Design a protein with these regions (language model features):
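Flexible loop/turn segments at secondary-structure boundaries
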Residues: 102-104, 129, 245-249, 302-305, ...
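Conserved, mostly hydrophobic/aromatic
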Residues: 77, 98, 129, 193, ...
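C-terminal accessory subdomain/extension
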Residues: 5, 348-450
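Active-site loop/helix belt of alpha/beta enzymes
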Residues: 184, 197-323
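A charged N-terminal "starter" segment
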Residues: 1-30, 39-154, 445-450
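Active-site-proximal beta-alpha core segment in soluble small-molecule metabolic enzymes
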Residues: 96-243, 248
Length: 450
């Protein structure tokens, strides 16, 4: 079953619920028993209707558990992993740990063919993962963690497992100052340089993409590469170029055809410009460091495009394993929602309304409706526009509310991937309609790095 469907005009819908349920957020068929009749009280689904409380595999699997809780559908997770490998066209995928935030699931995906190495988000996380047995960890962001740098440079095994990100000579100075003896020497630090990938128009007056590295031109990268190579205690091993405006911006947003076409035009031009500049940057850096080990690029939304570039040796991806709601809007791939959270119904204020506990878990980024979790199951629920998702309680409107009882679960999808794990101590791993394991998140292990 394809997790996303297209109508006759090619417009993509949201991923349907398990067992081919209609799109989340849609209302039941007018006039049906569930649209206007009494609550279904856990009876069999009405023909052609979305499942109500207790009817989904997630409800059956967690019937013995109280919400709030979070689950990962392992069949969906594994299918998403296989799709990432298919799209990477033989190039290894480095897993973005921030998009998973669960050691057990990092181990699971790294055991699969086609995945190699981690991309971490803080030095403290990197050191913890290295001490836990993970190897080949690329820290994707520069660090100012002096205590962590002191630890890294004092232990050759840690230094061999972790590669730090550098885009400024001052970061090299900070690393040297953090060495236990305060001077160069000791463990050799592995270094990766980052290329800015943003798309510039009108002589730089218009920028599309994240503000990341100050290193934009090949000559700038070559100059810093020479500084690294010529400095004792450092070894230049990699180059990274993360194209967030290509990998994380959907190009087929439901109900926004003009915006979607504009995004596609922008992304086509940006991909062409970046491919040329990345090739030149890699050539410039390899002239200084011929034994460069890797060139990393990509992101879930651009895996197949980045993999087609000869200059790139590996692809970064992570969100594509959980497939949060922000990744519903891509023409080039379809994913299966794998990570969900459930909130319990605690009130029934009136017809067509239920209230669940909590639920106000917005994602990072520019504030907007797309950063909110979306009610997923049962289908046909929406937020009250005057309240939205709340800190302690969330009212939900729609005909599906009348089929819910006190204590029933409402399932949500987070807007982003790993940020869900900052709200829950554990993930219940589901296969079919069974919980087969319960594993701690980073938070559940007492590790809240950001």
């Amino acid at each position: 079953m394809s997790p996303q469907t297209a109508d006759a005009h090619g417009d993509r819908a949201r991923p349907p619920a398990p067992d081919s349920s209609p799109t989340p957020g849609s209302s039941p068929t007018p006039g049906s028993a569930r649209a206007g009749g009494p609550p279904c009280a856990g009876g069999p689904p009405c023909a052609g209707e979305p499942p109500c409380a207790g009817e989904t595999p997630y409800d059956r699997a967690t019937a013995h558990l109280d919400a709030p809780l979070a689950v990962v559908d392992l069949q969906a997770f594994d299918a998403n992993a296989a799709d990432l490998v298919r799209r990477s066209k033989g190039k290894p995928i480095r897993v973005a740990s921030k998009s998973v935030r669960c050691r057990a699931l990092l181990e699971r995906v790294l055991a699969r063919e086609g995945f190699a190495g981690l991309m971490s988000f803080t030095l403290a996380e990197s050191l913890w993962l290295a001490r836990s047995g993970f190897r080949d960890i690329l820290l994707a962001y520069p660090t100012a963690d002096r205590a962590g740098l002191s630890e890294l440079t004092a232990e050759p095994q840690l230094a061999a497992a972790v590669t730090v990100m550098v885009d400024d000579p001052a970061q090299l100075d900070l690393i040297d100052a953090a060495r236990p003896d305060g001077a160069p020497g000791g463990a050799e630090v592995r270094v990766c340089l980052e290329l800015d990938t943003s798309f510039r128009l009108l002589g730089g007056k218009v920028r599309v993409g994240a503000r990341r590295s100050p290193l934009r031109e090949p000559a700038q990268l070559a100059a810093l590469a020479r500084a690294v190579v010529g400095r004792p205690g450092f070894r230049l091993v990699g180059l990274m170029a993360y194209e967030g405006h290509l990998a994380g911006v959907g190009d087929e947003v439901a109900g926004k055809p003009v915006f979607s076409r504009t995004v596609r035009v922008m992304q086509a031009a940006a991909r062409k410009e970046l491919a040329r500049r990345r090739w030149e940057a890699v050539r410039a850096v390899r002239a200084v460091a011929p034994r460069l080990e890797f060139v990393n690029g990509g992101g879930t939304g651009s895996v197949q495009h980045t993999a087609a570039e000869a200059a790139v040796t590996e692809i970064a991806a992570g969100s594509g394993l959980y497939v949060p709601r922000l990744f519903d809007n891509f023409r080039s791939f379809s994913g299966r929602p794998a990570a969900l959270f459930a909130q319990p119904v605690v009130r029934r204020p009136g017809p067509g309304v239920v209230t669940v506990l909590g639920g106000g878990y917005p994602a990072s980024g520019a504030a907007g409706a797309d950063r909110l979790p979306v009610p997923y199951l049962p289908a046909g629920l929406r937020y009250d526009p005057q309240e939205g998702p709340g800190e302690v309680q969330t009212p939900l409107l729609g005909p599906a509310a009348d089929g819910l009882r006190i204590g029933d679960k409402v399932w949500f999808r987070h807007a982003k991937a790993g940020e869900l794990c900052e709200r829950f101590d554990a993930l219940h791993l589901i296969e079919g309609d069974r919980v087969v394991d319960t594993v701690p998140t980073y938070r559940g292990e007492g590790r809240t790095f950001l």
